[in-house]
A protein has these predicted regions:
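A sensor for short, sequence-defined functional sites
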Residues: 1-186
Length: 186
């Protein structure tokens, strides 16, 4: 299995058993009670996902941050009190870089985070990362784009044609989640 396939497989294992309860937290209060319930905060899901990723032989670490709705971390004196959740960094040995993800998402996506967690200052909690590289910007990890092509022709008083759309990044993840919700409601 490739690096990406291992991460997606680990994410799918998590999502078969667990659901996100809509809450963001920095730590898990009672992780042993979360698994039998089948749902938990993003911290609960991320701790479980880190464990699964490590079982797959991958290096996975928490990345602490302050959610967008809670304001930016001060640059001069970042405070522990301002940290209120975390995402996951997984190290790709072949590419010598990290990819980021969050267990609260419905669809497994590398380097695409919920908008609430897309911030310009987060800190990787890994003993292997040099001090000067522990602060990371997870705001611009992936391109968020949409391309639309319209082919139209006039037929009498009507315009007929075809539209095709290509989505990248957050746009694509949101579309996939909406399509999944439509299928689940049938």
């Amino acid at each position: 299995m490739s690096f990406e396939e291992k991460i997606i497989c680990a994410f799918q294992i998590l999502k078969k058993k667990m659901a996100w309860n809509g809450r963001y937290q920095l730590y898990s209060k009672e992780l042993e009670k979360v698994i039998p319930k089948g749902n938990g905060s993003n911290a609960d899901l991320n701790f479980i996902l880190i464990s699964i990723l490590k079982d797959f032989g991958l290096e996975a670490y928490p990345v602490v941050l302050s959610r967008r709705s809670s304001g930016m971390l001060p640059y001069n004196f970042p405070s522990l009190q301002k940290l209120n959740t975390f995402i996951i960094a997984v190290y790709d040995i072949n590419k010598q870089k990290y990819v980021f993800l969050d267990g609260s998402m419905d669809v497994p996506a590398l380097n695409i985070l919920p908008l609430e967690l897309s911030v310009n200052k987060a800190r990787i909690l890994s003993p292997k990362v040099k001090e000067e590289k522990k602060w990371v910007n997870v705001m611009a990890l992936a391109d968020n784009k949409s391309f639309m092509k319209i082919e139209a022709r006039m037929e009498g008083n009507q315009v007929k044609g075809h539209r095709s759309t290509i989505l990248y990044g957050q746009e694509a993840v949101e579309y996939q989640a909406n399509e999944k919700d439509k299928q689940d409601s049938i």
